[in-house]
Amino acid sequence: WRPSAPIVGLGNVQPSLTVRRDGSVVAWMRDNGPPPHRLLRAESTDRGETWTPAVDSEIPNPGSGAEVRVLRSGEWIFIGNDVENGRHSLAVWMSQDEGETWGFRRRLVEAQAGQGSFSYPSLLEARDGWLHATWSEAIGGRETIRHARFNRAWIRAAGLNP
């Protein structure tokens, strides 16, 4: 084991890694840098030894935790706050081209800005194909952890991402 070269960027932290069919690795990172606030991405073609500089993706990110997973179907799924400011909206996005574009988006939960916070999401695909998401939720002074169970068809039913 040895550490890789750093992923250079403006405010990139907390990576979530995905591996393409060709073996290249994509690091998806929360954005704590200057606007525009987008999920940042960097790529490695040598198993993580070296990385491209972090660049903005099309997905908004207010500097909050996010997770990207590769599903057994080959589709990629992202869960995180889908706004540039605040954590009052949480969504899942789905890509059918290994993260090049994110054609489908479905909101899991939202509140008025300043009236709720949804953070620290996590996602897994169960053996039966169902997707399970958890996140921390704070509304009206109460904090809890929520869980949602859904499938890829539910995400697609929202239609193409505007």
Predicted regions and their residues:
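Asp-box/BNR beta-propeller blade signature and adjacent active/binding-site loops
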Residues: 1-162
